[in-house]
């Protein structure tokens, strides 16, 4: 499993000028067919506890921030199987999360997302190896 998390300059394009953040990462674990992404060290940047994401077998993403559940997001299917549209939803009125999913020909699943926290845009990506796909695509 490969993970990446990086801050994004508000004036730059989303990926073009993103730089790595080495002291902030997230850990992915599986519990009862649920993928849980828990961010580490975000409290060093924001005076709040870490952010946690859940992705369950019903393809619903739940976002919790500072122990408050803001939004439940469900994937929007495209015309083809495993083809998804990006989704944008408000978080607490001012913050947003944007995310997309893709699966390649080797059944490698990639989750891309952006989170706006305290006026800073963060981007992340997680790649899940084929041996973990059974937890996702039931």
Which sequence ranges carry the predicted segments?
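Surface-exposed, interaction-prone regions used to assemble/regulate multi-protein complexes
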Residues: 1-138
